[in-house]
Amino acid sequence: YVHIDSFETETAAQFEEAVKDLEDQGMKALIIDVRYNPGGMVTAVVQILDDILPEGTVVYTEDKNGNRQDYTSGGDTYLDYPLAVLINGESASASEILAGAVKDYQYGTLIGTTTFGKGIVQTIFPLENGDAVKLTTAKYFTPKGNYIHGVGIEPDIELEYEYLDKEAVSYDEAYD
C-alpha cells in the first residue's frame, strides 16, 4: 500500500523507495491511494507511471493552437504485480493522469468514486511586482484521447468512502 498525497519533485523517488521496501517484504500486489490528492507536477506523475506501465504515451497535452506534447513511459522498469488505484472526487489533475493511464492501459483496477475532473494544465507566471498570475495553458488527455475536464474518471469498482478507510484496506478486500 502506497499513499500519495501530492505529486511534487521528490514524489517519484519516494514512490520508488516505498515500492522497493514492499518488494523486500514479499509484495504480491500493489495498492496506490490517490484519494484526496489534488495533483501537482505533471513530471512527477509521469516518472511514477514510467515505473508502472509498459512503453507508450501515458498522457498528452494540447495547447490552444493544437500543439501536442506527449509524455511517455520507457517501459524498462514497469511493475509486474496486480495493481489497484484508490480514487475519489478529491483526486484531481495529476492524480487523474495516473488513474487515466492505468485505466486506458487496463493495467490495474480503479476503486472508489469518480474523480474531480480537472483536465487542464495551469502555469504560474511571476510578475515584476512579486505577484503572480495562474493561467490555463493546455488541456490534457488520457492515452486513449479522453478529455476528462468537468467529467472525471469513473472507477472500475465503485465504493463509497466509508468502505475505503485507507487504514483498513487490504489487497484481498479491494478485490472482493
Predicted regions, residues:
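Conserved functional hotspot residues or short segments at active or partner-binding sites
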Residues: I148-G150, E154-D176
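Short hydrophobic-aromatic micro-motifs
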Residues: V2, V133-L135, I148-H149
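Residues in well-ordered beta-strands of folded domains
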Residues: H3, V59-Y60, T136, E158-E160
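Short, acidic, Ser/Thr-enriched surface-loop or helix-capping motifs
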Residues: T142
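Cleft-lining beta-strand/loop regions that shape enzyme active-site pockets
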Residues: Y1-F125
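Short acidic, Pro/Gly- and aromatic-enriched capping/linker segments at domain boundaries
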Residues: L127-A138
